[in-house]
Amino acid sequence: MSASEGMKFKFHSGEKVLCFEPDPTKARVLYDAKIVDVIVGKDEKGRKIPEYLIHFNGWNRSWDRWAAEDHVLRDTDENRRLQRKLARKAVARLRSTGRKKKRCRLPGVDSVLKGLPTEEKDENDENSLSSSSDCSENKDEEISEESDIEEKTEVKEEPELQTRREMEERTITIEIPEVLKKQLEDDCYYINRRKRLVKLPCQTNIITILESYVKHFAINAAFSANERPRHHHVMPHANMNVHYIPAEKNVDLCKEMVDGLRITFDYTLPLVLLYPYEQAQYKKVTSSKFFLPIKESATSTNRSQEELSPSPPLLNPSTPQSTESQPTTGEPATPKRRKAEPEALQSLRRSTRHSANCDRLSESSASPQPKRRQQDTSASMPKLFLHLEKKTPVHSRSSSPIPLTPSKEGSAVFAGFEGRRTNEINEVLSWKLVPDNYPPGDQPPPPSYIYGAQHLLRLFVKLPEILGKMSFSEKNLKALLKHFDLFLRFLAEYHDDFFPESAYVAACEAHYSTKNPRAIY
């Protein structure tokens, strides 16, 4: 129903007003606001009443609310004094509940109190309010009664709405190491200037990288934990805080983080992580015709052979881990990215524009089908796997645990910790991010099985924006960002293994031919 059908409105569209907090569970305060729209609504008894669409100054448009006429006041000096009085009461009430001043949790209150005249006192507020109109007096009495009740009870807030408000005001930053920033620039240069593509499927895919990181993280956490009992040797036996694990040492949180990265990557890759020149390649490698299902008998035979021979802890049979070197193309080696390249810093964006089709692939230029073979020599293993193998030998056939005992004997409080820690490490070393039967043989594998570190790194450019649209408590967000930081350090430490220049090839050689599709385990 429109606003021009005879009903008289006290306020009009576009007028600057003061409006009460629309949520009855929150503190009774007045906000600076503006009327966006006016309509005729109905109350609970079906009577026609005016309703106003209110925009609160400084708030996101998503917080615009419809309010009844009795929730809106004119922008006058008297109502401004009432606004300041309610703001002071609300802040005092929050302080009395033990909340920090910097976390006032009342948007708009700080700006109201900043404009408070120094000579204005509570007594003057009472005197000025007593001379107001009858309508204002009635409102003042109701507000005073409600304020008195609120002062005796703790302010209750809806956690979900409060978290959303805080997230809108929070800026999330993920620091990317310098060596990885340069990798992002080189990646942009190779794709957009040199018209190269990352050869797919990657030799070390994202599943392998994430699983390797969890094992790397767990091993480092366990070895650093060995020193902890020495410093807490004098703690009393009854103290149960010895079981506390900091977020940056928590393996379960690390597993949740990498699983979240996997899910986020699979979803966002086609939306925001591909350059326009890569769109056609993505459609090809994710088609059902590109990958052929593996025969169950061949798979079981291959895995049984792998189980009989010792292997590094991070070479997981469930993920593609080819040891074939990149095929030579006959072209000169790809040069380094030129400096001061203006297009090398362009941002990632989604585009429906397809890149130009490759020239026809000849049989001689088609990449051979890589075969899974066992890592029987250290020369075929990346530096990361060699490093972890030397640091933590895994005796899969031996019942003796990994030696994790500190040099000094600990107290009885920590006597049972070593066995538990050893079991946890052995469990983590056999842990897999996805089950063996995923993805099903009749379905194309998800992007995390095909793409590698080059595209995973791009995700961290977009993560602050993605996280800004999610609801996290301050504590959980801080822990998550800490784990992101540790993971980026891991990528930076082994960037020579994860980001080889040979990964970028000509567009016509950027994927295996459909005649010889690459096996996905």
Swiss-Prot record:
Residues 13-71 form the Tudor-knot domain. Keywords: Chromatin regulator, DNA-binding, Intellectual disability, Nucleus, Phosphoprotein, Transcription, Transcription regulation. The keyword Cell inner membrane does not apply. Residues 139-149 have a biased composition (Acidic residues). The gene is MSL3. MSL3L1 gene undergoes X inactivation. The keyword Transcription regulation applies. Pfam families: MRG, MSL3_chromo-like. Residues 150-166 have a biased composition (Basic and acidic residues). GO terms for biological process: positive regulation of DNA-templated transcription; regulation of DNA-templated transcription. This is MSL complex subunit 3. Coiled coil: none annotated. It is found in: Nucleus. Expressed in many tissues including liver, pancreas, heart, lung, kidney, skeletal muscle, brain, and placenta, with highest expression in skeletal muscle and heart. It is linked to Basilicata-Akhtar syndrome: An X-linked syndrome characterized by intellectual disability, global developmental delay, progressive gait disturbance, poor or absent speech, facial dysmorphism, and mild distal skeletal anomalies. Non-catalytic component of the MSL histone acetyltransferase complex, a multiprotein complex that mediates the majority of histone H4 acetylation at 'Lys-16' (H4K16ac), an epigenetic mark that prevents chromatin compaction. The MSL complex is required for chromosome stability and genome integrity by maintaining homeostatic levels of H4K16ac. The MSL complex is also involved in gene dosage by promoting up-regulation of genes expressed by the X chromosome. X up-regulation is required to compensate for autosomal biallelic expression. One of its GO terms (molecular function) is histone H4K16ac reader activity. It comes from Homo sapiens. Residues 316-329 have a biased composition (Low complexity). One of its GO terms (cellular component) is nucleoplasm. Component of the MSL histone acetyltransferase complex at least composed of the KAT8/MOF, MSL1/hampin, MSL2 and MSL3. Interacts (via the MRG domain) with MSL1 and KAT8/MOF.
